[in-house]
Amino acid sequence: MEQEGQNTFEFEDNPEPLDVAAGERKLVTQPYDYSVDQLTSHVDKRKILLMEVPYQREYVWDDAKASRLVESLLLNVPIPVCYFAENEDGTWEVIDGLQRVHSIVRFLKDDLALRGLSVLTELNGKQFSEISARDQRRVESRTLRFVVITDESHPDIKFDVFERLNTGAVKLAPHELRNCIYRGAFNDTLKDLAQMDSFRRAIGRGKDSRMRDEEMVLRFLALHENLSGYKPPVTQFLNEHMRRNRQRRPSQEVVAIFDATMQHIASIFDGRAFRIIQEEGKPATNVNRALYDAVSLSFAFADLGSITGKESRIREAHHELLSDSTFQVFIGRATADRTRMHGRVRKYSEMLKSLDIPSSLPHLPEA
């Protein structure tokens, strides 16, 4: 079993092209030129949500770096554009430029004493209230360029733009971006289900800090609801499921199915169900997402009551299937392909059926 904080995941193949009709590729942006004074006013009035949105990275700039930004404002040095996303309620979230925005607000609220200035050295050690009235006005009147991606934009194009702007030293994982764009009751439920003891035991207990656990839960819910209708790209499929259900929590029945599925998988495989077997016969360190699809969905549609007494046979058949060349293709490369998605779930379900475990798996097109 893995230790806390050590869970790792195999990533999908190279990013897939978006499947958005030409006429629907709508991206609406609105540029604004705001003074620093207007910026702080918007933060105070919660027009701009700062450091209160779960996806946003922590404030990591030290005082010296923040001070140099303030010095740039005073010297009229150009400041890079800041990008925001507009929510349905009209509020803005910082997508790119959080460190800059937060540093400016800190200074105007006397939460930053300048240090390490190389040009305006006489201001070192001073807070905003301690600099001259002239310098205060220079800072407050300095204009910043904001670009807002409005709520009118097509959600998949919007997601793609966020990925392009995702240029930090450690880029946001796909579900960290979803956590920003699709905040609501459904997203909250994903977090709750990812903490379920049954799920933690099924995947090996390791807690992933990049929200990949929540993405695994999302995969289950989205595919369980519409496996036969699945089509790639998988990122877009998951995005659409979150967008459509943003303000709705999954039904108690679906949550119960998820919990029961993970309980049975955990008890049978002891945290190794979603890991392929390496050449030396040991389970891989990484969680294989394609194998997760096959195992979790097959169990979800199976008659779990028929499993009792067959646990060892299931483990043996599972290991044999992992050596099957066709199944290896289904969980190997290009795993988001519709045929391979359906193929791996169908083949695993057939394995369970061969052990007299009935299944209600919906019809899956061959191609």
Model-derived features: positions:
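Small-residue-rich helix-loop
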Residues: 234-284, 291
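Long, highly charged low-complexity segments enriched in Glu/Asp and Lys/Arg with interspersed Ser/Thr
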Residues: 251-259, 336-362
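Basic- and aromatic-enriched surface patches that contact anionic nucleotides/nucleic acids
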Residues: 2-41, 50-243, 308, 315-320, ...
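Amphipathic alpha-helical interaction surfaces
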Residues: 107, 223-227, 244-247, 268-271, ...
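Short amphipathic alpha-helix initiation/capping segments at coil-to-helix junctions
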Residues: 210, 251-258, 284-292, 307, ...
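C-terminal hydrophobic structural anchor segments
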Residues: 275-326
